[in-house]
């Protein structure tokens, strides 16, 4: 059905021309002819008058009118076909140009979006690198501070240990001195007790 419809659309003017020519032929044939009778024939858009003549002349004029109408219809059909072909060509060209423009627009939009994506990626990588560098610098600074604090604490511990050792040494020396003094005092007391005891023993001999 679609093929028949397409064929009718394609050859519609030829069909119209053929029907018009056939109708004109039948009309002129019915009106023409007869002895002494006049006939009126249409050629194109103007009448052709036959004042008087035989049936042969009428038939000749009818045939001429039919040929003229048929030729005119054929020319109109050909012109319409050319116009349809030109319109189809223009529409096809327009569709091609529109498609090319759409493709160009799509390509431009794609390139623009790709460029924007690359810019966003570069910005993201730059921000990430900056953030990473800042964080790394902070970690290095914290590590340095921590190491410095550890070292300071170690030095303080060593210093306190040295002071404790000095204090212990002083304490030991002091205790040793006290012991020596106590021993000396004890020895003196012993000597004093011995001397006193000797005196008592010596005095006892006389009494």
Curated annotation (Swiss-Prot):
Residues 64-95 form a coiled coil. It comes from the Viruses. It is found in: Virion membrane. It is a single-pass membrane protein. Keywords: Capsid inner membrane protein, Coiled coil, Membrane, Transmembrane, Transmembrane helix, Viral genome ejection through host cell envelope, Viral penetration into host cytoplasm, Virion, Virus entry into host cell. Component of the phage ejection machinery. Pilot protein for the formation of the tube that conducts the genome into the target cell. Probably involved in penetration of the bacterial outer membrane and for making the peptidoglycan layer accessible to the viral transglycosylase. Essential for viral infectivity. This is Infectivity protein P11. It comes from Enterobacteria phage PRD1 (Bacteriophage PRD1). The lineage of its organism: Viruses, Varidnaviria, Bamfordvirae, Preplasmiviricota, Tectiliviricetes.
């Amino acid at each position: 059905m679609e093929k028949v419809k397409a064929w009718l659309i394609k050859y519609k003017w030829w069909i119209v021309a053929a029907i018009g020519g056939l109708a004109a032929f039948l009309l002129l044939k019915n009106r023409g002819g007869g002895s002494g009778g006049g006939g009126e024939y249409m050629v194109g858009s103007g009448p052709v008058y036959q004042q008087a003549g035989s049936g042969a002349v009428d038939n000749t004029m009818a045939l001429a009118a039919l040929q003229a109408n048929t030729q005119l219809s054929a020319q109109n059909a050909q012109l319409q076909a050319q116009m349809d072909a030109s319109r189809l060509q223009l529409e096809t060209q327009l569709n091609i140009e529109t498609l090319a423009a759409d493709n160009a627009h799509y390509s431009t939009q794609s390139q623009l979006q790709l460029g924007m994506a690359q810019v966003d990626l570069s910005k993201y990588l730059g921000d990430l690198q900056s953030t990473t560098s800042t964080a790394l610098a902070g970690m290095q600074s914290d590590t340095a501070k921590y190491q410095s604090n550890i070292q300071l604490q170690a030095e303080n511990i060593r210093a306190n240990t040295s002071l404790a050792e000095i204090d212990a040494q002083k304490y030991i020396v002091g205790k040793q001195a006290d012991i020596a003094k106590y021993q000396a005092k004890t020895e003196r007391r012993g000597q004093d007790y011995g001397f006193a005891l000797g005196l008592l023993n010596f005095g006892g001999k006389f009494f």
